[in-house]
């Protein structure tokens, strides 16, 4: 298998630069304003000039303005970015047989049948980058690998406007020696848990396989072990984004369940209003007072109805509050694996 991972570099900010060339060379910060106060909210993304100042995604806007006094702060224009994303994804799809859209600015592409080897894949990736730049003026980074995760990792290492490749014979050593923080899906909390027991490189999980499930759960343990043993081969699946979410800013930072539940209920109602089908997964997502993100989820064989969603979400919220002592700033739900119910009997089961 030969997979490309395409990452639209600092996407929202880059689109703003394309639409307004006078922004080029200036620190540009695209923000999500919460509406509490004039500068309440968080940074969605920033260009590399802003990042050099220390401004990064998730940072409170008020702090970003203290750091970047001369930076240009812009509100997020999601509809504009979605239009550009659709056009770019259409270009990318022409270079492979299966396109898996991971997010508004990331995609996996299976090119196994389009090229005879990895050197030819590199040439194809160059052509893809050139066409996107010519038609949309957008710079993207491409990673090439024998599976999705390796392709993503090498892309992350070659930003911005880069092209990275890992050949099959290099994968085993590359993954074994990879710093655990570089593994997709390993966040700050998981990283801390793993480092405490001496897991600093991905290869270290092999010697800790017996205790790994207790540390990070069965699903993540299996994922990490399959990567470390070079047996990860999840295919690229032809699909667009199959989740819907809605997040609400709380009136004030709090841990009080009674103050959080009305906002959680509202986010459920709005998320379900956008769904055309039955979600098989539900996640509660909490943005903490320091803008760290914590989530808990649950899967259902036959889906979860809106009527049932609130009780499930409350259960997941309780788990977050029990495991984390910080106050919540925002709360919401994400509905995943949205599908059509085969029969009414299945859905009501």
From Swiss-Prot:
<feature type="site" description="Substrate discrimination">
    <location>
        <position position="12"/>
    </location>
</feature>
<keyword id="KW-0963">Cytoplasm</keyword>
<comment type="similarity">
    <text>Belongs to the DNA polymerase type-Y family.</text>
</comment>
<feature type="binding site">
    <location>
        <position position="105"/>
    </location>
    <ligand>
        <name>Mg(2+)</name>
    </ligand>
</feature>
<comment type="function">
    <text>Poorly processive, error-prone DNA polymerase involved in untargeted mutagenesis. Copies undamaged DNA at stalled replication forks, which arise in vivo from mismatched or misaligned primer ends. These misaligned primers can be extended by PolIV. Exhibits no 3'-5' exonuclease (proofreading) activity. May be involved in translesional synthesis.</text>
</comment>
<dbReference type="GO" id="GO:0003684">
    <property type="term" value="F:damaged DNA binding"/>
</dbReference>
<dbReference type="InterPro" id="IPR050116">
    <property type="entry name" value="DNA_polymerase-Y"/>
</dbReference>
<keyword id="KW-0238">DNA-binding</keyword>
<keyword id="KW-0234">DNA repair</keyword>
<keyword id="KW-0808">Transferase</keyword>
<keyword id="KW-0515">Mutator protein</keyword>
<keyword id="KW-0235">DNA replication</keyword>
<keyword id="KW-0227">DNA damage</keyword>
<dbReference type="InterPro" id="IPR043128">
    <property type="entry name" value="Rev_trsase/Diguanyl_cyclase"/>
</dbReference>
<dbReference type="GO" id="GO:0006261">
    <property type="term" value="P:DNA-templated DNA replication"/>
</dbReference>
<feature type="domain" description="UmuC">
    <location>
        <begin position="3"/>
        <end position="187"/>
    </location>
</feature>
<keyword id="KW-0239">DNA-directed DNA polymerase</keyword>
<dbReference type="InterPro" id="IPR022880">
    <property type="entry name" value="DNApol_IV"/>
</dbReference>
<keyword id="KW-0460">Magnesium</keyword>
<dbReference type="InterPro" id="IPR043502">
    <property type="entry name" value="DNA/RNA_pol_sf"/>
</dbReference>
<dbReference type="GO" id="GO:0042276">
    <property type="term" value="P:error-prone translesion synthesis"/>
</dbReference>
<dbReference type="InterPro" id="IPR001126">
    <property type="entry name" value="UmuC"/>
</dbReference>
<dbReference type="Pfam" id="PF11798">
    <property type="entry name" value="IMS_HHH"/>
</dbReference>
<dbReference type="Pfam" id="PF00817">
    <property type="entry name" value="IMS"/>
</dbReference>
<feature type="binding site">
    <location>
        <position position="7"/>
    </location>
    <ligand>
        <name>Mg(2+)</name>
    </ligand>
</feature>
<keyword id="KW-0548">Nucleotidyltransferase</keyword>
<dbReference type="GO" id="GO:0005737">
    <property type="term" value="C:cytoplasm"/>
</dbReference>
<dbReference type="InterPro" id="IPR024728">
    <property type="entry name" value="PolY_HhH_motif"/>
</dbReference>
<dbReference type="GO" id="GO:0003887">
    <property type="term" value="F:DNA-directed DNA polymerase activity"/>
</dbReference>
<dbReference type="GO" id="GO:0000287">
    <property type="term" value="F:magnesium ion binding"/>
</dbReference>
<keyword id="KW-0479">Metal-binding</keyword>
<comment type="subunit">
    <text>Monomer.</text>
</comment>
<feature type="active site">
    <location>
        <position position="106"/>
    </location>
</feature>
<protein>
    <recommendedName>
        <fullName>DNA polymerase IV</fullName>
        <ecNumber>2.7.7.7</ecNumber>
    </recommendedName>
</protein>
<dbReference type="InterPro" id="IPR036775">
    <property type="entry name" value="DNA_pol_Y-fam_lit_finger_sf"/>
</dbReference>
